[in-house]
């Protein structure tokens, strides 16, 4: 009987004994990282997939448990209690109840939990920037789910006031550099270009003895491309300079005026060369002032040949007629018509050329020339006098200038002529007016006499048009010319401006005066104003003048007296 009662008692006690929770539920605990609190657990050996779990929590010191909404009869094995355990100064408890499909249940509670103490720190968020010789590391702030009283989320720096960062940089695990501090930006200097480094960054909280997991980054410094940049800059500068030069050359080529055609090149077409002195021929006008003042007075010309600068032996022959030089006197008239009826006897002014040097100054300076003789005069000894400078004088009521041309033709072989009237020849030193206006005589009146007479009568003269006369050896006027000496130049009627230039050809020679044997009629159209030649051109090979006459010799003067009287300017070209 006693044995039966013992079996019944043990069976009833076994039926009322609690189940072991380790068979259905185990490892219930809080896992907190950066103050994110997660409750986790594992199922026991007898747990099945259809086992459900329910979670409850309470603050330390309270008796009642609070069921967690959203974590009742769940099959997952975790529940987030961050909000329910967000107070950093409180301690919390949590428990899990597991119920199997067979009706078995098990409950297990966590240990006391403090977020400040039990939370762990995650690795920081860092940005590594590689440079040529340095590596820069920027630590970003780590946010937490904890909210402040105003609702904004706190960071680790806000929660742990003694938090600081520890940085380490190493190369091949041999060379290490360390930096630390509370700032968020760090940079390692003095690194080798094009080298790989391993960086490690950790968060340290000394008060709670916490260290975060290290953040690791592999960074390679940049290669040194300074020479590449220098070369590129030099290349770009060279290309820019080349483009600028090409643009400038293109602009110059486009804006350059086109070259004139050869047909417009006058220097190739013309054969004469201006301002080149060769042998000089001068026509000295002789006036007859005895005629009525209302008629223009005829002009006769005495030809003078003056030798130019000597050329060295063997020098090439210069161009004869085409190479000329003009000595201008455009504004000063030498002779003007006069109404003074009585003839005036002027003291003769002699012309004395002297030897001249080869080259003269640009403006006229009288030079010493070889001795010369006037026509119709006996040779005389020439006195050497210092040349005087020429100063042109302007006269009132100046006439328009005129000129004369002596041209070479076939007149050397033509019959010579004589003056149509004997009054063409007169004693030296006498100047008479001739009534006829159509005759032109060559006589013994020197150029200085004519100049003196013109200067005295300049106040009484009227402004009249000057007649132009042309002296030529090519043709002759049968109405004007008569037979005379052979080789004398012939004179054609025409109108020329005043004498303003002298042509000098190459060979030096004496200065005899050659009287023309044929009269020159200025015009056939009635009275015309008389004037003085201003320009003269003669060839160098003109026939030499006959021997000068011996009667009534004039006292010779210097060459500068002639040009001073005529107000001419002589320019020499080397």
Curated annotation (Swiss-Prot):
One of its GO terms (molecular function) is interferon receptor activity. Disulfide bonds join 71-79, 128-217. Residues 16-228 are extracellular. Keywords: Cell membrane, Disulfide bond, Glycoprotein, Membrane, Phosphoprotein, Receptor, Repeat, Signal, Transmembrane, Transmembrane helix, Ubl conjugation. It comes from the Eukaryota. InterPro entries: FN3_dom, FN3_sf, Ig-like_fold, Type-II_Cytokine-TF_Rcpt. GO terms for biological process: cytokine-mediated signaling pathway; defense response to Gram-negative bacterium; negative regulation of inflammatory response. Expressed in colon, liver, lung, pancreas and kidney. No expression in immune cells such as monocytes, T-cells, and NK-cells. Expressed in keratinocytes of normal skin as well as in psoriatic skin lesion. Detected in normal blood brain barrier endothelial cells as well as in multiple sclerosis lesions; Strongly expressed on central nervous system vessels within infiltrated multiple sclerosis lesions. Overexpressed in synovial fluid cells from rheumatoid arthritis and spondyloarthropathy patients. GO terms for cellular component: plasma membrane. Residues 250-574 are cytoplasmic. It is found in: Cell membrane. The chain crosses the membrane at residues 229-249. The keyword Disulfide bond applies. Component of the receptor for IL20, IL22 and IL24. Component of IL22 receptor formed by IL22RA1 and IL10RB enabling IL22 signaling via JAK/STAT pathways. IL22 also induces activation of MAPK1/MAPK3 and Akt kinases pathways. Component of one of the receptor for IL20 and IL24 formed by IL22RA1 and IL20RB also signaling through STATs activation. Mediates IL24 antiangiogenic activity as well as IL24 inhibitory effect on endothelial cell tube formation and differentiation. Failure of medical and surgical therapy in Chronic rhinosinusitis with nasal polyps is associated with decreased expression of IL22RA1. Belongs to the type II cytokine receptor family. This is Interleukin-22 receptor subunit alpha-1. It comes from Homo sapiens (Human). The gene is IL22RA1.
């Amino acid at each position: 009987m006693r044995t039966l009662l013992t079996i019944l008692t043990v069976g009833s006690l076994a039926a009322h004994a609690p189940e072991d929770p380790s068979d259905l539920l185990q490892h219930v605990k809080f896992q907190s990282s950066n103050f994110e609190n997660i409750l986790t657990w594992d199922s026991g050996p007898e747990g099945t997939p259809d086992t459900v779990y329910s979670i409850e929590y309470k603050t330390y010191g309270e008796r009642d448990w609070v069921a967690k909404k959203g974590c009742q009869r769940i099959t997952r094995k975790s529940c987030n209690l961050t909000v329910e355990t967000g107070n950093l100064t409180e301690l919390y408890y949590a428990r899990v109840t597991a119920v199997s499909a067979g009706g078995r249940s098990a409950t297990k509670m966590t240990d006391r939990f403090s977020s400040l103490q039990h939370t762990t720190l995650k690795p920081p968020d860092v940005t590594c920037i590689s440079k040529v010789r340095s590596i820069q590391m920027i630590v970003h702030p780590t946010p937490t789910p904890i909210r402040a009283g105003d609702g904004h989320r706190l960071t680790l720096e806000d929660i742990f006031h003694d938090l600081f960062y520890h940085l380490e940089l190493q190369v091949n695990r041999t060379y290490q550099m360390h930096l630390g501090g509370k700032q968020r930006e760090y940079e390692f200097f003095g690194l080798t270009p094009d080298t790989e480094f391993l960086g490690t960054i950790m968060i340290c909280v000394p008060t709670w003895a916490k260290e975060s997991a290290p953040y690791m980054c592999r960074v390679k410094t940049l290669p040194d491309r300074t020479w590449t940049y220098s070369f590129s800059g030099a290349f770009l500068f060279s290309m820019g300079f080349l483009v600028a030069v090409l643009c400038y050359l293109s602009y110059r080529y486009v804006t350059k005026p086109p070259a004139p055609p050869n047909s417009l090149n006058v220097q190739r077409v013309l054969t004469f060369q201006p301002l080149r002195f060769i042998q000089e021929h001068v026509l000295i006008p002789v006036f007859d002032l005895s005629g009525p003042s209302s008629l223009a007075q005829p002009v006769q010309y005495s030809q003078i040949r003056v030798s130019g600068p000597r050329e060295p032996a063997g020098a090439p022959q210069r161009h004869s007629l085409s190479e000329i030089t003009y000595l201008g006197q455009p504004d000063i008239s030498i002779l003007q018509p006069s109404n003074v009826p009585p003839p005036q006897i002027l003291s003769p002014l002699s012309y004395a050329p002297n030897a001249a040097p080869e080259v003269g100054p640009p403006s006229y300076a009288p030079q010493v020339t070889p001795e010369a003789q006037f026509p119709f005069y006996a040779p005389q000894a020439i006195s050497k006098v210092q040349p005087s400078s020429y100063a042109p004088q302007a006269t009132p009521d100046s006439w328009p200038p005129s000129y004369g041309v002596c041209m070479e033709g076939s007149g050397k072989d033509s019959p010579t002529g004589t003056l149509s009237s004997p009054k063409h020849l007169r004693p030296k030193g006498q100047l008479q007016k001739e009534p006829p206006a159509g005759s032109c005589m060559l006589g013994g009146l020197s150029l200085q006499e004519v100049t003196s007479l013109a200067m005295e009568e300049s106040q009484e003269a009227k402004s009249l048009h000057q007649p132009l006369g042309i002296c030529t050896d090519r043709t002759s006027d049968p109405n004007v010319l008569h037979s005379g000496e052979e080789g004398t130049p012939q004179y054609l009627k025409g109108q020329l401006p005043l004498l303003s230039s002298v042509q000098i050809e190459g060979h030096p020679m004496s200065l005899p005066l050659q009287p023309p044997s044929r009269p020159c009629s200025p015009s056939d159209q009635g009275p015309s104003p008389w004037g003085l030649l201003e320009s003269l051109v003669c060839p160098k090979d003109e026939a030499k003048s006959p021997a000068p006459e011996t009667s009534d010799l004039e006292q010779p003067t210097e060459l500068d007296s002639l040009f001073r009287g005529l107000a001419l300017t002589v320019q020499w070209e080397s």
